[in-house]
């Protein structure tokens, strides 16, 4: 590839607690990635002192996780690795307390999920049982728009690389992911041993029967042997540059000598100096004077970029975290009076009825919203209605709900602007439900503030 920039992709790793996620992820990062030898040697030494011979890779990840949990920001390079085609970032692995919330409000949308399944006797069955986390994670990934999936069948060494066991698991898992919504034909099934590092990067020599994986997607047929091959064969993501701008604000700074600087991640569209932007729901319109990222001036900010931009005649009191910036001339963002969403209740101890008012985390907004009407209960898999106007919904149920925010907020339909159309419902310090927004009733407010800078720019 020479010096050309490789495409960046984001991976999320899902699967049951003991499926070997850490070991497998650790191995990829260890072998293809961002962990330098010095760090590895340090970890290896510590592992030996603790008698953790099994260290190999999980230890690396445990160290990173522990540091992350304690709020030590670790060098994010540690969560990166490379394939021939891609720069890969592992954006999260479950088990992390806020996994579900991260996956929804997530700083980034995953392009692909790797589902890790343990092949050991009894282990596989436990992971995929009715109440299994595996089902929940796979369903979440699918519901939240992670379109591509890779299945890694791990711990094959514990089955002596048994072909019948592999085939049995492939058959079961195919049925399982089909129920969730994925097409098994588009999914590579890769036998591996994360612990031994077998068939991860180099083809295994332990499975003469294994001819490799195949998948067929919109981009054609692909085949390969190893897990790394499967990651390299992910269909390249399309970044939503063509859509109108949506930029949820993470913070707003006041910088002396410069003025007001909102900061956030461009989710769709582009932002450039000279553009006249509208903030919703605060309904303020002004001109963008400059855009920068990592202290460098940009001619434009693209989807995925975390940018700061300087705006004139707007005080820090007028725009805040949770507001959304958009192009005033191209489908500008608006506040909403209410919205309808498909809500899936994950773990709520009681019943949820009309009037329930938990906090919603949607992009960077964190606002209490009332479940004002339960419109219909639906089958999670097919999306078909099974009951109109149910009185209550409980854990495991999915429903279309009319939601009313307690104060102005800006959201969008998931089909129009995915990152602004999915949310986590938080209550009792945990994620009790997730939702995907179907339609939005926008506030048709007129007479918002239009700054002098915006009026001038309009005349140009």
From Swiss-Prot:
Binding site for GTP: 15-22, 92-96, 154-157
Localization: Cytoplasm
Modified residues (N6,N6-dimethyllysine): 3, 317
InterPro entries attached to this UniProt entry: EFTu-like_2 (IPR004161), G_TR_CS (IPR031157), GTP-eEF1A_C (IPR054696), P-loop_NTPase (IPR027417), T_Tr_GTP-bd_dom (IPR000795), TRAFAC_GTPase_members (IPR050100), Transl_B-barrel_sf (IPR009000), Transl_elong_EF1A/Init_IF2_C (IPR009001)
Modified positions (N6-methyllysine) in chain numbering: 3, 31, 317, 391
Disulfide bonds: none
Keywords: Cytoplasm, Elongation factor, GTP-binding, Methylation, Nucleotide-binding, Protein biosynthesis
Family: Belongs to the TRAFAC class translation factor GTPase superfamily. Classic translation factor GTPase family. EF-Tu/EF-1A subfamily.
Protein name: Elongation factor 1-alpha
Organism: Coccidioides immitis (strain RS) (Valley fever fungus)
Gene: TEF
């Amino acid at each position: 590839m020479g010096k050309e920039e490789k495409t960046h992709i984001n991976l999320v790793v899902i699967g049951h607690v003991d499926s070997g996620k850490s070991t497998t992820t650790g191995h990829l990062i260890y072998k293809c990635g961002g962990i330098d030898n010095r760090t590895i040697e340090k970890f290896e030494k510590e592992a030996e002192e603790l008698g953790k011979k099994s260290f190999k890779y999980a230890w690396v990840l445990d160290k990173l996780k522990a540091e992350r949990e304690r709020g030590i920001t670790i060098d994010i390079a540690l969560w990166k690795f490379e394939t021939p085609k891609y720069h890969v970032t592992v954006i999260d692995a479950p088990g992390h307390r806020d996994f579900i919330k991260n996956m929804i409000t997530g700083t980034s949308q995953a392009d692909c999920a790797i589902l890790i399944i343990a092949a050991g006797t009894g282990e596989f069955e436990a992971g995929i049982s009715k109440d299994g986390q595996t089902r929940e994670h796979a369903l979440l990934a699918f519901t939240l728009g992670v379109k591509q999936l890779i299945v890694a069948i791990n711990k094959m060494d514990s089955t002596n690389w048994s072909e019948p066991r592999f085939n049995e698991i492939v058959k079961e898992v195919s049925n399982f992911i089909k129920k969730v919504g994925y097409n098994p034909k588009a999914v590579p099934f890769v036998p591996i041993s994360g612990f031994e590092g077998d068939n991860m990067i180099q083809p295994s020599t332990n499975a003469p029967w294994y001819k490799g994986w195949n998948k067929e997607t919109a981009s054609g047929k692909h085949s390969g042997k190893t897990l790394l091959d499967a990651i390299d064969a992910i269909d390249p993501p399309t970044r939503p540059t063509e859509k109108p701008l949506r930029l949820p604000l993470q913070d707003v700074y006041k910088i002396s000598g410069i003025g007001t600087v909102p900061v956030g991640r461009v989710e769709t569209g582009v932002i450039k100096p000279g553009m006249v932007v509208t903030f919703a729901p605060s309904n303020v319109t002004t001109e963008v004077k400059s855009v920068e990222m990592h202290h460098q001036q940009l001619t434009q900010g693209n989807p995925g970029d975390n940018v700061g931009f300087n705006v004139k005649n707007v005080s820090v009191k007028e725009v805040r975290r949770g507001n959304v910036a958009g192009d005033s001339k191209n489908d500008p963002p608006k506040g909403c009076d209410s919205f309808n969403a498909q809500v899936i209740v994950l773990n709520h101890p009681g019943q949820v009825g009309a009037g329930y008012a938990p906090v919603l985390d949607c992009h960077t907004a964190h606002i209490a919203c009332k479940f004002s009407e339960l419109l219909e209960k639906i089958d999670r898999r097919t999306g078909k209605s099974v009951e109109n106007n149910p009185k209550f919904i409980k854990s495991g149920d999915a429903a279309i709900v009319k939601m009313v925010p307690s104060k102005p907020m800006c959201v969008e339909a998931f089909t129009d602007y995915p990152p602004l159309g999915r949310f986590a419902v938080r209550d009792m310090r945990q994620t009790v439900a997730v939702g995907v927004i179907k339609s939005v009733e926008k506030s048709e407010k007129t007479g918002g503030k239009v700054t002098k800078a915006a009026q001038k720019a309009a005349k140009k």
